Amino acid sequence: MTIKKSNDTSFFGHPGGLRTLFFTEMWERMSYYGMRALLVLFMTASLQTQGLGFTVATAGAIYGLYTGAVYFLGLPGGWLSDRLIGGKKAVWYGGIIIFLGHVVLAIDLQNLFFVGLILVATGTGLLKPNISAMVGQQYGDDDARRDSCLLYTSDAADDLFR
């Protein structure tokens, strides 16, 4: 897959397409770290306080599996985009799947809780490895701006909202 390299420097002296990638990455990281901050607390809260009532050990195990799945699913997500659907579609589908996962998590049914976690992890596995590759494709091979840390700034920017 090739992405059109833009000479448009409308985003802090970088290609205009970086703006979309920057904010997509920022909100994906907000989703991920926000989930990490609340997941164990929600699982261990009592049923009377609208939690799931899991033991700390069970909640910790689920948290570990979720976190591991988020990072592991980047491998098949990268393969899928390289071989079948392309990076743009992988980022798009990944974002939609993450959104649907959060919608499912908002539904007050314990049975859907795990479905929501699986959807968020799967969507992140599609989005995360591909968005980083797309940032590099915004620049020419000899463009000094290619090594900029601007994408990582989007990770830090979401800290302002947490």
Where are these regions (language model features)?
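Conserved MFS/SLC helix-loop-helix module at the cytosolic interface between two early adjacent transmembrane helices
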Residues: P76-G94
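Conserved small/polar residues in nucleotide/adenosyl-binding loops
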Residues: Y152-A157
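Short amphipathic helix-loop junctions that connect adjacent transmembrane helices
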Residues: L38-T58
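Intracellular juxtamembrane helix-capping segments at the cytosolic ends
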Residues: L127-Y139
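Central cavity-lining transmembrane alpha-helices of secondary-active solute carriers
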Residues: G64-G78
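Hydrophobic core of transmembrane alpha-helices in multi-pass small-molecule transporters
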Residues: L112-L126
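Cytosolic juxtamembrane N-terminal segment immediately preceding the first transmembrane helix
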Residues: T2-F23
